Curated annotation (Swiss-Prot):
It comes from Vibrio cholerae serotype O1 (strain ATCC 39541 / Classical Ogawa 395 / O395). The keyword Nucleotidyltransferase does not apply. GO terms for biological process: translation. The lineage of its organism: Bacteria, Pseudomonadati, Pseudomonadota, Gammaproteobacteria, Vibrionales. One of the primary rRNA binding proteins, it binds directly to 16S rRNA central domain where it helps coordinate assembly of the platform of the 30S subunit. This is Small ribosomal subunit protein uS8. GO terms for molecular function: rRNA binding; structural constituent of ribosome. Pfam families: Ribosomal_S8. Keywords: Ribonucleoprotein, Ribosomal protein, RNA-binding, rRNA-binding. Part of the 30S ribosomal subunit. Contacts proteins S5 and S12. GO terms for cellular component: ribonucleoprotein complex; ribosome. Belongs to the universal ribosomal protein uS8 family. InterPro entries: Ribosomal_uS8, Ribosomal_uS8_CS, Ribosomal_uS8_sf.
Length: 130
């Protein structure tokens, strides 16, 4: 069976891994998944990530905990294959009053909502992380 939404699958694996107190989660790799993982690491939501293998590359994300609780309290897919969500630069959402991050796909690549606002770019809202 083919996977319809690989990004939702990635977010669900992260959510389930943290619910089960796993150290790391593995999933099939893609350029978009690696870019999302890099953004989550830069924002401090995951400890690390690595791509393993050449032909069937796997993305391994090392989860981050603080005082035995997951750092990511909420991770939610916004734009999905059946309903894409695009926002202009002045319509970009602020997640949890600025405490969370909206992952935005812009013409200059993936970036956080703050970086997109600063660069004056809008785009597709991939997910919210808080």
């Amino acid at each position: 069976m083919s996977m319809q939404d690989p990004i939702s699958d990635m977010l669900t694996r992260i959510r389930n891994g943290q619910a089960a107190n796993k150290v790391a989660v593995k999933m099939p790799s893609s350029k978009l998944k690696v870019a999302i993982a890099a953004l989550l690491k830069a924002e401090g939501y995951i400890a690390d990530f690595a791509v393993e293998g050449e032909v069937k590359a796997e993305l391994e994300i090392t989860l981050k905990y603080f005082q035995a609780k997951p750092v990511i309290e909420q991770i939610k897919r916004v734009s999905r294959p059946g309903l894409r969500v695009y926002k202009k630069k002045d319509e970009l959402p602020s997640v949890m009053g600025g405490l969370g991050v909206a992952v935005v796909s812009t013409s200059k690549g993936l970036m956080s909502d703050r970086a997109a606002r600063k660069a004056g770019l809008g785009g597709e809202i991939i997910c919210y992380v808080a």
